[in-house]
Amino acid sequence: TVWGVVGFTVFALAPALGLPAELPGSTAAALEARQVWWFFAAGGAGVGVALMVFARNWWMPVVGIVALALPHLVGAPHPEAYVSGPLPAELAGQFAASSLVVQAIFWAVMGWTAGEVWSRMDEVAEAA
């Protein structure tokens, strides 16, 4: 389950801090710019977590923190002007929160499943 938490942090939580889930039809920046930023946010979080967890030198966690924070310091692309649509703002907040909850459940199940598979593979390898 630890790897499920890491997966959630890297692929859902870190990118959502800059680009929360958006309702369909809402005003947003260009798709390509958002995709590039998401890639760098997830990549920076992955590299950052790896450097913090598997550090062999004192400076590696520092580089990991910088890698994790850099996309957020640069900033995610946002539209120049927001145009409110027919949907209430409360719905957008509820959608973003629900999206994170569903992703957290997904990554928890994924981490548990991976742990079960790995433990059964170890049992089979020991029995052979």
Label every PLM stretch briefly:
Residues 6-49:
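Membrane-proximal helix-loop-helix units in multi-pass membrane proteins
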Residues 2-17, 41, 66-74, 106:
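Alpha-helical transmembrane segments of multi-pass integral membrane proteins
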Residues 36-37, 54-128:
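C-terminal transmembrane helix-loop-helix hairpin of multi-pass membrane proteins
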Residues 1-2, 32, 97:
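Membrane-water interface at loop-to-transmembrane-helix junctions
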